């Protein structure tokens, strides 16, 4: 796969552990790529669910994917401030079709006031049993929750105000 460059549009596909397609985002604009990560933006992006329901994202969001960490981060930019939705997920892979990852159900929501909430624990436990997540995956995900919380608490990477401003401004430059 040719590495997408700044200003290119890619598709993002989220799968479940059993290999079923979970969700697809069309036309995510790439803001930056390097050997380990991709930063992009969704702005009124078409999302298709596994049951073919479709919806469009309401606000611009900076998305961050990494090849080594078991999470991805969505910084949702609203008038009242930035909030975050973090998916516990496999590191991404990129092929000719899309950026792809496995969604492991657990999510961390960070509200604009900094409050954090772990979401979908019951869904994770149900899928862990039904889809037979290996113990290694369970351990990796729990360790990555700790890394993610450290990033949040210390405003690392996508959780810094500067990060969101830099990439949101870059998006506006590219879309002209």
Curated annotation (Swiss-Prot):
Catalytic activity of the protein: a ribonucleoside 5'-triphosphate + H2O = a ribonucleoside 5'-diphosphate + phosphate + H(+); a ribonucleoside 5'-diphosphate + H2O = a ribonucleoside 5'-phosphate + phosphate + H(+)
Ranges in a coiled coil: none
Residues given in the record as Mg(2+) 2 binding sites: 105, 107, 120, 123
EC number: 3.6.1.15, 3.6.1.6
Residues that coordinate or bind Mg(2+) 1: 87, 103, 107
Record's keyword terms, sorted: Hydrolase, Magnesium, Metal-binding
Active site (record annotation): 23
One Pfam family here: DUF402
Cofactor: Mg(2+)
InterPro entries cross-referenced by the UniProt entry: DUF402 (IPR007295), FomD-like_sf (IPR035930), Ntdp-like (IPR050212), SA1684 (IPR016882)
SUPFAM superfamilies: FomD-like
UniProt GO MF annotations: magnesium ion binding; nucleoside diphosphate phosphatase activity; ribonucleoside triphosphate phosphatase activity
Enzyme class name: hydrolase
HAMAP family in UniProt: Ntdp (MF_01568)
Role according to the record: Has nucleoside phosphatase activity towards nucleoside triphosphates and nucleoside diphosphates.
Family affiliation: Belongs to the Ntdp family.
Name of the molecule in the record: Nucleoside triphosphate/diphosphate phosphatase
Organism: Lactococcus lactis subsp. cremoris (strain MG1363)
Lineage: Bacteria, Bacillati, Bacillota, Bacilli, Lactobacillales
């Amino acid at each position: 796969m040719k590495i997408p460059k700044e200003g290119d549009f890619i598709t993002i596909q989220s799968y479940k552990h059993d290999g079923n397609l979970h969700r697809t985002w069309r036309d995510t604009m790439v803001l930056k790529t390097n050997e380990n990560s991709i930063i992009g933006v969704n702005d009124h992006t078409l999302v298709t669910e596994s049951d073919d329901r479709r919806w469009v994202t309401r606000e611009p969001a900076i998305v961050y994917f990494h090849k080594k960490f078991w999470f991805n981060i969505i910084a949702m930019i609203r008038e009242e401030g930035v909030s975050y939705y973090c998916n516990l997920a496999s590191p991404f892979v990129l092929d000719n079709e899309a950026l792809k990852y496995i969604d492991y159900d657990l999510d961390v929501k960070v509200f604009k006031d900094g409050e954090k909430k772990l979401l979908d624990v019951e869904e994770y436990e149900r899928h862990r049993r039904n889809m037979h997540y290996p113990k290694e995956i369970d351990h990796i995900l729990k360790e990555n929750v700790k890394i993610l919380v450290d990033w949040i608490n210390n405003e690392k990477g996508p959780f810094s105000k500067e990060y969101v401003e830099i990439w949101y401004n870059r998006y506006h430059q590219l879309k002209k």
